[in-house]
C-alpha cells in the first residue's frame, strides 16, 4: 500500500476526527483527485511542442495525458478553435498518492529558494492549487532530454467542505505550508 495512503488511514483520520469532531471515519475529508496541467502556448507556432509536453507529463505522472484544445478563437494570440494548446492528467487512487508523495518529498524540496507553499491558494471549497515554474524539480526528468523548461499547474481536489479542513488534511499529509 502507498505510504501516504497508509499515513492517511493510521494518522490523519484519527487526528481530523479529534480536531473537527467527526463521529464517523468516512466523514473525514480525503483527497479525491489531483489534476496536473501544462499549458503549451508555443504550440500555436510549433505543433511538436505538444508532444514534448505530453512526454514530460507522462514521465512525471506515469499516466498518458489528454491533449486539451482551444474552446474559442482569439485573434490576438493567433489561436483558432480546436487547436491543441495544453496537456492534462487526472490522477486518482494509487497513482494519485504516489504523485503526491513524490511532490511533497522529492519535487518541492528541489524548488529554488523554497520556503513552503502558500497557505492562501485554496479556492473556498476545500481545493488547493499550486504552480511550478519548471518540470526539472521532478527527479524523472533529465536536463539533457528536454527541449525547453515548462511550468505546470497542480490542483488537489479534496472532499473537504472548508479551506480550514483541507489545509489541515494536507498539512497532516506533509504539505510544507509557509508559516
UniProtKB/Swiss-Prot annotation:
Pfam family, one: Ribosomal_L5_C
Organism superkingdom: Bacteria
Any single GO BP term: translation
GO MF: rRNA binding; structural constituent of ribosome; tRNA binding
Gene3D superfamilies assigned: 3.30.1440.10
Keyword terms of this UniProt record: Ribonucleoprotein, Ribosomal protein, RNA-binding, rRNA-binding, tRNA-binding
GO cellular component terms, semicolon-separated: ribonucleoprotein complex; ribosome
Subunit and interaction comment: Part of the 50S ribosomal subunit; part of the 5S rRNA/L5/L18/L25 subcomplex. Contacts the 5S rRNA and the P site tRNA. Forms a bridge to the 30S subunit in the 70S ribosome.
Family: Belongs to the universal ribosomal protein uL5 family.
Functional description taken from the UniProt entry: This is one of the proteins that bind and probably mediate the attachment of the 5S RNA into the large ribosomal subunit, where it forms part of the central protuberance. In the 70S ribosome it contacts protein S13 of the 30S subunit (bridge B1b), connecting the 2 subunits; this bridge is implicated in subunit movement. Contacts the P site tRNA; the 5S rRNA and some of its associated proteins might help stabilize positioning of ribosome-bound tRNAs.
Listed name of the protein: Large ribosomal subunit protein uL5
Organism (species): Dictyoglomus thermophilum (strain ATCC 35947 / DSM 3960 / H-6-12)
